[in-house]
């Protein structure tokens, strides 16, 4: 198959949604707007997010050939006609699977869709448009041959949410390319035992859904106890303009009680910087109040040899049962996170055991090779049916 062009380029999608003339302009203009460097530059610009705009765009996208981006659907299908026929077509989520109808009409090719958080986005939208989008997605789901999820919890949730029969959902345990994380974890960490202060870390998107405010509350509670006066909180991750006010409010909470000198925000990190960040922690927690379908950040911490503390809901109980390397806290107990963090911070023996379990568990069950093999097995099964 030749090198694929860009389909559904962000600039074109936006303009086709908002300015009718762009739905009919010739391809040479679309090609200019799809220029990768131009798309990348626009993606980096700060932008405020209008929920109504997002809702309308999502509805249009899932409607496929009946939406405002129908030109993109037709171009994709036309391009596929001139390529070697693929054995399987795999969409990374159902929200972008609008072309499925046209693809099914043109080709006899199995369609696979990974479900990994579509519902989280949908639940952020207001009614009645949310119900319209879900209804369109339920209709799309009937055309999909197989769905892939990363946990039993999410499989059960998706059967209800999109009216999918359980036999059409397969589980592929989440995996990551952990080589450099594992290498870092295997190196001598004696300097971690001699550095001043203990460190709790958070590495995920900065937003209410990931629960940074809950971790900050626990950090403050611990710091107010004399036995944790050396404690520090390190935070890293993407911060959007939409969530800046939320983050500033959290910073003010810490400053108000005089602990700002022990709080550090590292910003968005490259992969090498992530690895270095994680190696310097004693504990890791992203106490997401919503039911996380994946939890990739947990695998990164575990692979780095950092014990994790996560809520006992969503994908986390299954993930930690598989890998070890962490403990769960009850989401129904407001003091449970603080209690588990305190117990681990004061119990070096348990922390050491968990730090050893994490990399071993990731290596045995959660590397990218395991996920790739499980996905290939599903492809083979579909093709044999």
Positions of the model-derived regions?
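Conserved donor-binding/catalytic core segment of Leloir-type glycosyltransferases
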Residues: 191-210, 216-219, 234
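A conserved catalytic-core segment of Leloir-type glycosyltransferases
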Residues: 1-78
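Glycosyltransferase donor-sugar binding loop
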Residues: 232-251
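A short, well-ordered alpha-helix in the C-terminal region of glycosyltransferases
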Residues: 336, 343, 350-365, 371-377
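Conserved acidic donor-binding segment of nucleotide-sugar-dependent glycosyltransferases
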Residues: 322, 327-334, 343-349
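Nucleotide-activated donor-binding/catalytic signature segment of Leloir-type glycosyltransferases, i.e.
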Residues: 247-269
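Short hydrophobic beta-strand element within catalytic cores of glycosyltransferases
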Residues: 307-310
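Carbohydrate-associated surface elements
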Residues: 153, 175
């Amino acid at each position: 198959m030749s090198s694929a062009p860009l389909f559904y380029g962000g600039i074109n999608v936006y303009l086709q949604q908002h300015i009718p003339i762009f739905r009919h302009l010739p391809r040479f203009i679309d090609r200019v707007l799809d220029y990768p460097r131009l798309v990348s530059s626009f993606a980096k610009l700060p932008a405020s997010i209008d929920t109504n705009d997002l809702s309308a765009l999502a509805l249009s996208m899932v409607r496929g050939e009946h939406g405002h981006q129908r030109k993109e659907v037709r171009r994709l299908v036309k391009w596929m006609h001139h390529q070697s026929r693929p054995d399987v077509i795999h969409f990374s989520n159902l929200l972008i699977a609008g072309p499925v109808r046209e693809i099914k009409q043109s080709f006899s090719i199995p369609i696979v869709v990974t479900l990994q958080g579509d519902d989280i986005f949908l639940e952020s939208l207001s009614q009645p448009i949310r119900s319209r989008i879900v209804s369109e997605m339920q209709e799309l789901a009937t055309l999909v041959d197989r769905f892939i999820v990363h946990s039993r919890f999410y499989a059960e949730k998706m059967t209800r949410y999109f009216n999918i029969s359980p036999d059409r959902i397969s589980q592929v345990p989440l995996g990551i390319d952990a080589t450099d994380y594992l290498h870092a974890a295997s190196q001598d960490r004696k300097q971690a035992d001699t550095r001043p202060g203990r460190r709790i870390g958070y590495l995920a998107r900065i937003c209410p859904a990931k629960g940074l405010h809950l971790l900050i509350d626990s950090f403050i509670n611990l710091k107010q106890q004399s036995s944790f006066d050396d404690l520090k909180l390190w935070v890293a991750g993407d911060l959007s303009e939409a969530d800046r006010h939320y983050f500033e409010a959290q910073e003010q909470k810490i400053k108000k009680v005089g602990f700002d000198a022990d709080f550090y925000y590292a910003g968005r990190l490259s992969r090498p910087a992530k690895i270095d960040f994680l190696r310097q922690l004693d504990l890791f927690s992203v106490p997401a109040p919503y039911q996380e379908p994946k939890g990739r950040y947990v695998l990164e911490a575990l692979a780095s040899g950092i014990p994790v503390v996560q809520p006992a809901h969503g994908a986390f109980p299954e993930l930690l049962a598989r890998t070890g390397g962490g403990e769960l806290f009850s989401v129904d107990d407001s003091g449970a996170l603080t209690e588990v963090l305190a117990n681990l911070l004061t119990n070096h023996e348990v922390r050491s055991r968990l730090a050893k379990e994490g990399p071993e568990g990731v290596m045995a069950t959660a590397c990218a090779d395991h996920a790739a093999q499980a996905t290939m097995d599903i492809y083979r099964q579909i093709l044999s049916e």
